């Protein structure tokens, strides 16, 4: 059974996460306030960051960078910018 939450990212009612997908207090905040749709948008941005910046999840600094970018994207309204990336034209 899916849960409906008010997604603070999308600013509308949406289907919430099925379980806490990230550890700690940030994970609880994501579970409570971020919809599946918004999380999917973040995962696309995360993949772009990992690929373009050649991040490795083995390195603590790279994981910390991703977490900072995730918080800024999901909770502070800041988009992810990757130098050299040009979005496709519609």
From Swiss-Prot:
The UniProt record lists the keyword Iron: yes
GO cellular component: cytosol
Signal sequence region: none
Pfam short name (any one): Iron_traffic
Keywords, alphabetical: Iron
Molecular function as annotated in GO: iron ion binding
Coiled coil: none
InterPro entries the record matches: Fe_traffick_prot_YggX, Fe_traffick_prot_YggX_sf
The UniProt record lists the keyword rRNA-binding: no
Gene Ontology BP term (one): cellular response to oxidative stress
Role description: Could be a mediator in iron transactions between iron acquisition and iron-requiring processes, such as synthesis and/or repair of Fe-S clusters in biosynthetic enzymes.
HAMAP family, alphabetized: Fe_traffic_YggX (MF_00686)
Binding partners and assembly: Monomer.
NCBIfam families: PRK05408.1
Family (UniProt): Belongs to the Fe(2+)-trafficking protein family.
Protein name stated in the entry: Probable Fe(2+)-trafficking protein
Organism: Hamiltonella defensa subsp. Acyrthosiphon pisum (strain 5AT)
Lineage start: Bacteria, Pseudomonadati, Pseudomonadota, Gammaproteobacteria, Enterobacterales
